[in-house]
């Protein structure tokens, strides 16, 4: 059975998380130690800035949970706000993690790769085998559905993302477009990063060239002094003003002359409050001026889209958990159903052989009687098998129907109850 034990940003502080942080050079030793714990068969560790979570295939889930808790708290040297999950709930958590539904920023793309890498490294170390490989495959399939069927990974909510979205509405894709960012503060940095992520060519202009150079180095762009702005306006497709006061080059008269020379559209984004770019500049032909109110509307729409996407993603997670539960029920019920079918088939075969001894050897008749007996066994046991699978899914060995089947058919095999050995 799948077991998950760990902590994350939702219930643990940075201080709690950092005492469990696993540097890559310690991962192999940790995997070996955790796999050797009581009740644990296979193990993988997802360790990021926001979480340290252990996923284990356990022959005895209760023992595995206890031993993993003790091991983690021993590593920390104190008690920790650890969560403990089993079976379907452990799988649900893994799906939510891989789909970024548990992330600090909904939709962030890094976690899927981190989960995949964690399980692959565990497999390479010999700590994870077939059971965790199957769990990972199902979780990744669920995460892929969330990414492709919802807007969870597409609806960004930030000033920079909103600025990029507005510019894209006017100019189309920003890849290869030239974006001039005026200023080198936090708003300038965030917007420059988003423009870079859109594969735009970013140039940073600032009164203090050293600050422009630092930001340009961070985003892989160019740095120019602010007095080069008028020259830059002849080339830029997008201008982002993240400075408290607009340079003289953005005045209506100057911009009119620049527009006459450049003869193409330009998007201007004013991030200042009070607004720094004159409204008269925004009224010029081929100028598309956006201010913080425009950005706010885009952000609110993105937030609404993201909330709707999250609801859709939760429904997908529910569907995938149900698939997982059915597969687990099939696996747990298989020994019971197999024994029941084997006994019935053996009885049918004995009766066929007894009939053939009376009727004499006839290969064609034997073939037909075997087929008939097999068909009878399958049809008689189809409904009981279906009911038993559902009973195992609902309650495992504790379900009255399962107990009754074991008694009625005198079976030795029985599925594990939830929380017992898998």
Curated annotation (Swiss-Prot):
Q: Where does substrate bind?
A: 48-51, 103, 108-110, 114
Q: Which SUPFAM superfamilies match?
A: Glutamyl tRNA-reductase catalytic, N-terminal domain, Glutamyl tRNA-reductase dimerization domain, NAD(P)-binding Rossmann-fold domains
What PROSITE patterns does the record tag this protein with?
GLUTR (PS00747)
Q: Which GO terms describe its molecular function?
A: glutamyl-tRNA reductase activity; NADP binding
| Matches recorded under Pfam families | GlutR_dimer, GlutR_N, Shikimate_DH
Query: Where are the catalytic residues?
Result: 49
- EC number(s) recorded for this UniProt protein: 1.2.1.70
Q: Which keywords are on file for this protein?
A: NADP, Oxidoreductase, Porphyrin biosynthesis
Instruction: Write out the GO biological process terms.
Output: protoporphyrinogen IX biosynthetic process from glutamate
Q: Does the keyword Membrane apply?
A: no
Q: Where is this site: Important for activity?
A: 93
Catalysed reaction equations from the record: (S)-4-amino-5-oxopentanoate + tRNA(Glu) + NADP(+) = L-glutamyl-tRNA(Glu) + NADPH + H(+)
Positions with a binding annotation for NADP(+): 183-188
Record text on subunit structure and interactions: Homodimer.
| UniProt remark on domains | Possesses an unusual extended V-shaped dimeric structure with each monomer consisting of three distinct domains arranged along a curved 'spinal' alpha-helix. The N-terminal catalytic domain specifically recognizes the glutamate moiety of the substrate. The second domain is the NADPH-binding domain, and the third C-terminal domain is responsible for dimerization.
What further note is attached to this protein's record?
A: During catalysis, the active site Cys acts as a nucleophile attacking the alpha-carbonyl group of tRNA-bound glutamate with the formation of a thioester intermediate between enzyme and glutamate, and the concomitant release of tRNA(Glu). The thioester intermediate is finally reduced by direct hydride transfer from NADPH, to form the product GSA.
Q: What family is this?
A: Belongs to the glutamyl-tRNA reductase family.
The protein's matches in HAMAP family, at most eight in alphabetical order, are given as: Glu_tRNA_reductase (MF_00087)
Please report the name of this protein according to its UniProt entry.
Glutamyl-tRNA reductase 1
Lineage of this protein's species? Bacteria, Pseudomonadati, Myxococcota, Myxococcia, Myxococcales
């Amino acid at each position: 059975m799948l077991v998950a034990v760990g902590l994350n940003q939702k219930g643990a502080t940075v201080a709690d998380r950092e005492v469990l942080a696993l540097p890559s050079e310690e991962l192999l030793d940790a995997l070996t130690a955790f796999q050797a714990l009581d009740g644990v068969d296979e193990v993988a560790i997802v360790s990021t800035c926001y979480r340290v979570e252990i996923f284990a295939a356990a022959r005895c889930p209760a023992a595995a949970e206890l031993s993993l808790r003790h091991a983690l708290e021993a590593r920390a040297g104190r008690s920790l706000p650890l969560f403990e999950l089993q079976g379907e709930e452990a799988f649900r958590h893994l799906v939510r993690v891989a789909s970024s539904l548990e992330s600090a920023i909904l939709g962030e793309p890094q976690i899927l790769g981190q989960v995949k890498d964690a399980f692959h490294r565990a497999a390479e170390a010999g700590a994870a085998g077939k059971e965790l490989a199957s769990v990972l495959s199902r979780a990744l399939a669920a995460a892929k559905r969330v990414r492709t069927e919802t807007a969870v990974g597409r609806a960004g909510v930030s000033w920079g993302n909103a600025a990029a979205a507005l510019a894209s509405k006017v100019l189309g894709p920003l890849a290869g477009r030239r974006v001039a960012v005026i200023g080198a503060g936090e708003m300038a940095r965030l917007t420059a990063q988003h423009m870079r992520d859109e594969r735009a060519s970013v140039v940073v202009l600032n009164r203090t060239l050293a600050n422009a150079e630092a930001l340009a180095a961070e985003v892989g762009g160019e740095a120019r002094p602010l007095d080069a702005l008028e020259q830059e306006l002849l080339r830029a497709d997008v201008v982002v003003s993240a400075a408290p006061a607009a340079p003289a080059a953005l005045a209506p008269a100057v911009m009119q002359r620049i527009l006459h020379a450049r003869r193409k559209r330009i998007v201007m984004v004013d991030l200042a409050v009070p607004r720094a770019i004159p409204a008269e500049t925004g009224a010029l032909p081929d100028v598309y001026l956006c201010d913080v109110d425009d950005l706010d509307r885009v952000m609110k729409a993105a937030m609404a889209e993201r909330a709707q996407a999250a609801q859709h993603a939760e429904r997908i997670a529910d569907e995938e958990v149900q698939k997982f539960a059915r597969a687990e029920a099939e696996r747990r019920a298989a020994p019971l159903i197999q024994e029941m079918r084997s006994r019935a088939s053996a009885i049918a075969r004995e009766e066929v052989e007894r009939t053939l001894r009376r009727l004499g050897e006839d290969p064609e008749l034997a073939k037909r009687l075997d087929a008939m007996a097999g068909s009878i066994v399958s049809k008689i046991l189809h409904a009981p098998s279906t009911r038993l699978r559902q009973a195992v899914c609902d309650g495992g060995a504790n379900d009255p129907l399962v107990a009754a089947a074991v008694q009625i058919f005198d079976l030795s095999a029985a599925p594990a109850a939830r929380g017992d050995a898998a």
